[in-house]
């Protein structure tokens, strides 16, 4: 077809931080899928819904809503000469890099230059650096040219935040670098669930509310300031790998769900739908390359992970990250494999620059009580059984509602045991899990669906 006969609508870039959802008939598009939903003519898409349940967020161009899709990376949406929508796959620039080897020295120079440039651009302002003590925020703080410009903020995961490993490491780093460091206490973030669904709708599960509380408190106490994020730096740097993908069912390996999804066996729809056949066939040869699998993992999960900068942006912060820059990302990914694996190249850099914190591991708490305690501090409204039971097993919805009440003594004891040093690895092998957190993870996947169904019912009553 002659390209001149096409009418350009919108195009997605190489990474997809800014989502592009679109109506399959009209071509109307928006970053918020909620803008496109017709509640008076609503129908779930079975394949898209099952994909959402499996991943905990939308994946592979599908959404749970019939007639609404999203553009994947390097795709352009057109009207063809007959006025029909057409998706065109553009060249993928990352493919040119997956067989190359980059220079560590050059990679460090690129990261430093990016951070310095943003700091210089905001030379007369304080800069917010969310600091976990992990590698990415550690590098941002280290490469910031004027330490007095930085205000670092951390939160802890355990019931005693000041003993959390993130907080101890962040405080130590900031003391070494003479950076103003602050701890932000969070825990009431479930009150932001309505705001989350308003901003992200059905694009992902409702599990990022803690960032709304975190940045809201920073904003209230310090006003808005430019922010440098370490978003996805760990994935480019070698923190994880993706096992081989040899069949459609292996495509779930690109999800990195960390348990925040919903078991499709509790869904009443046809669960035998093979949601991933098309995606596997299109990319199976490229997915033989371990680096391309990392790229695909990041591109898949960016549907969710983009909230790491979208939440502060929604609250008024100007955000930047070196780890969203194409050249930096490709340089990090293509470090010599033996140096890239487990981030050895970064570990050696920290040793060389007196930023190694491994000696603090035994002095820190690795408990994660954040979600559990949030259900006590701000109890969740039970899921609407009547609304959800036509799609999901009623008994399981009732089980979720029962076990999100984490103030129950039996659930508190179980959670404490599950986080005890010697039991946390034994219990899962015995089939024992932290019931309240399993319920919480299922809840946050279903809650955006419930909100859509509520709006459908409201429209029906009019």
Which residues does each predicted region cover?
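Short hydrophobic alpha-helical segments that form membrane-spanning helices or hydrophobic packing faces
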Residues: 21-25, 140-142, 237, 329-334, ...
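Adenosyl-5′-phosphate
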Residues: 68, 253-462
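Conserved adenosine/adenylate-binding substructure
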Residues: 124-127, 190-241, 272-319
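Short catalytic/ligand-binding loop motif for oxyanion handling, primarily in non-cytosolic enzymes
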Residues: 17-21, 97-98, 136-139, 190-193, ...
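Glycine- and acidic
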Residues: 95-102, 152-157, 196-200, 310-316, ...
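Cysteine-centered catalytic environments shared across enzyme families
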Residues: 1-185, 199
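ATP-dependent adenylate-handling ligase core
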Residues: 158-218, 231-255, 285-286, 333-337
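Generic recognition of stable, solvent-exposed alpha-helical segments in well-folded globular domains
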Residues: 72, 106, 110, 135, ...
